[in-house]
From Swiss-Prot:
GO terms for biological process: cell division; proteolysis involved in protein catabolic process. It comes from Albidiferax ferrireducens (strain ATCC BAA-621 / DSM 15236 / T118) (Rhodoferax ferrireducens). The keyword ATP-binding applies. HAMAP family: ClpX. It comes from the Bacteria. GO terms for molecular function: ATP binding; ATP hydrolysis activity; ATP-dependent protein folding chaperone; protein dimerization activity; unfolded protein binding; zinc ion binding. GO terms for cellular component: HslUV protease complex. This is ATP-dependent Clp protease ATP-binding subunit ClpX. Keywords: ATP-binding, Chaperone, Metal-binding, Nucleotide-binding, Zinc.
């Protein structure tokens, strides 16, 4: 390194790259017969920063992306059963985020990978929403859940479809880059089906009209989102969000779809030689396994929307055994949650196997799936939880079959109090 000011007989040194003298730069670093100035070093650092990060970043992201097996294993911790749906979701989500990695380092002449949005079909309480929530939590991406029944066409009372993107932005503190890689779950998508499978000649602002509005959003468009929400109006600033890389998962119970599938798969026969099958022979789960895009169109979804959700996963009706597992096995199982609540009062909770089966049977009778389990358990413990804070020496609360079926109060086990001498 040379000083800027030398003695009168000292030779002036120059940068071997830009040609500036030692007096024109702050520092000059000397090598074997070569000199480089601080400005050229800064320029080299900028070039390296511009060229290297994409490839190294892609390698780092790829290693952090969980495999389909890891995604499914994580789903197993929270969602009981639904093996085919979990495998389908795991592959679809893995491919989606792998596609995003590919886009970051792809060249113009590379194969362009299209987005595959997902449609979940299953009875109420079968785990559609929980699957989407668990996926987003595992991948650490912004997640928002929207209700399709609240959406209307632009210009009508209700929510615009852009409000979905606004909620996604709000979930990540308006970080546009993060929001553009998030997951949107649209629930009750079956409730916006058009009223008949013929094109509508009248305005259907909460059915076919909403489906049309969702088309471009799901496929990928530059959405103009009002930062404060509400309706758009002139002279307003908008946040531009590209929805191309947002993964849309739509879900619905599709009540009545089984009739459409039956009409297609079971041709009615006439005459003595005809085979007539009872529709009661097949469960809802078996019927849903045979769903085709044409059935969804017949049900009331417009063909364009069905085409934009190529990944189709059906969820099975939950059996009594599955509901018992849901009560006890997942990480955030209901029994564990209520045990934790009572432990805060210094009391243990015991729910006997017969009571677990009774809860499952009651939920099946209500046809609410896993969603009905909490209300049944809450109802059986509500009076006990009300009294516990004012009751001393309770050691354990025991719930048996009679508590569920006959609404009898749970059994309270008291601690032995040492008698005073």
């Amino acid at each position: 390194m040379a000083e800027k000011k030398g003695s009168s007989g000292e030779k002036t040194l120059y940068c071997s790259f830009c040609g500036k003298s030692q007096h024109e730069v702050k520092k000059l670093i000397a090598g074997p017969s070569v000199f480089v100035c601080d400005e050229c070093i800064d320029l080299c650092n900028e070039i390296i920063r511009d060229e290297l990060p994409p490839s190294t970043e892609a390698r780092g992201d790829s290693s952090e992306l969980p495999t389909p097996l890891e995604i499914k294993t994580n789903l197993d911790n929270y969602v009981i059963g639904q093996e085919p749906a979990k495998r389908t979701l795991a592959v679809a989500v893995y491919n989606h985020y792998k596609r995003l990695r590919h886009q970051e380092k792809a060249k113009k002449d590379d194969v362009e990978l299209a987005k595959s949005n997902i449609l979940l079909i299953g009875p109420t309480g079968s785990g559609k929403t929980l699957l989407a929530q668990t996926l987003a939590r595992m991948l650490d991406v912004p997640f928002v859940m929207a209700d399709a029944t609240t959406l209307t066409e632009a210009g009508y009372v209700g929510e615009d479809v852009e409000n979905i993107v606004l909620k996604l932005l709000q979930s990540c503190n308006y970080e546009v880059e993060r929001a553009q890689r998030g997951i949107v779950y649209i629930d009750e998508i079956d409730k916006i089906s058009r009223k008949s499978d013929n094109p509508s000649i009248t305005r259907d602002v909460s059915g076919e009209g909403v489906q049309q509005a969702l088309l471009k959003l799901i496929e990928g468009t530059m959405a103009s989102v009002p930062p404060q929400g509400g309706r758009k109006h002139p002279n307003q600033d908008f946040v531009q969000v590209d929805t191309t890389n947002i993964l849309f998962i739509c879900g619905g119970a599709f009540s009545g779809l089984e009739k459409v599938i039956d009409n297609r798969t079971q041709s009615s026969g006439m005459g003595f030689g005809a085979t007539v099958k009872s529709k009661e022979q097949r469960s809802l789960t078996e019927v849903f396994k045979e769903v085709e895009p044409e059935d969804l169109i017949k049900f009331g979804l417009i063909p364009e929307l069905v085409g934009r959700m190529p990944v189709l996963a059906t969820l099975a009706e939950l059996s009594e055994d599955a509901l018992v597992q849901i009560l006890t096995e997942p990480k955030n199982a209901l029994v564990k949650q209520y045990s934790k609540l009572l432990a805060m009062e210094g009391v243990d909770l015991e729910i006997r196997p017969s009571a677990l089966k009774a809860i499952a049977k009651k939920a099946l009778a209500r046809k609410t799936g896993a969603r009905g389990l909490r209300s049944i358990l809450e109802q059986s413990l509500i009076d006990t939880m009300f009294d516990l804070p004012n009751t001393s020496n309770v050691d354990k609360v025991v719930v048996d079959e009679s508590t569920i079926d006959e609404n009898k109060p749970p059994l309270l086990v008291y601690r032995e109090v040492a008698k005073k001498a």
